[in-house]
Amino acid sequence: MTINSSFLASKLTKKPIIWSISGADCSGGAGIAADIKTGHSLKVEVCHLITANTVQNSKRVSSINPIEVKILAEQAQALRIDKPPAVIKIGLIVNGEQINWLVALLLSLKAQLPDLLVVYDPVGQASVGDCLTTLSTIELISLLPLVDVITPNVFEAKQLNALHEKRSNNDTLNMAENILLLGCNAVII
């Protein structure tokens, strides 16, 4: 049997694929745009599933326009066909319907791709302070056991910490330990 050298070369030089599941920030400073910039600087291919179109700039958020789950499912199906992920990076999830869809997607992908790594940056508010999601912290419970690494800032860690009966208000180590007990494999605050 002969192996085509160009086929072999393409397999050996194939870039890892990251799926970014997040919002689109029209100012380019956050969300999908930031993930694409970061991914390209790391020499990986970035595919994106857009959860919301936000209208914002460096001063304020004017509107958040959630994408229907039906469209998210179509985006995921299109990518599953020829661009399966090595990593999924989750950012803005706008509502409970999106969480339910995401949990089902991750369960399916992890069954198909056992080495899949899931990173969650729990975006709840914009850098200008406006709330970006109607999602309650309690709705995240079903997602957290599917997350390999969660990267909350201190404010987000305090919100997640409120889900645990042994709350710790300011100690980042205790907050991280409590978040781990919610099902994540690793926490970076």
PLM region spans:
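Conserved phosphate/ATP/ADP-binding segment of small-molecule kinases
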Residues: D130-I189
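Rossmann-like NAD(P)(H) cofactor-binding subdomain of soluble oxidoreductases
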Residues: L117, D121-L132
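Small-residue (G/A/S/T)-rich helix-start motifs and N-terminal tracts that mark the onset
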Residues: M1-V87, L163, R167-I189
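Generic enzyme active-site microenvironment
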Residues: V87-K89, V119-Y120, T151, I188
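A short helix->loop->beta-strand "cap" motif at the edges of active sites that frequently abuts
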Residues: L109-V118, L182-N185
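Active-site beta-loop-alpha junctions enriched in small/polar residues
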Residues: I93, V123-Q125, F155
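Non-cysteine beta-strand/loop elements that form the S-adenosyl-L-methionine
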Residues: C47-T51, L117-D121, L143-F155
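N-terminal glycine-rich "phosphate-gripper" loop used for MgATP/nucleotide binding
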Residues: K89-I99
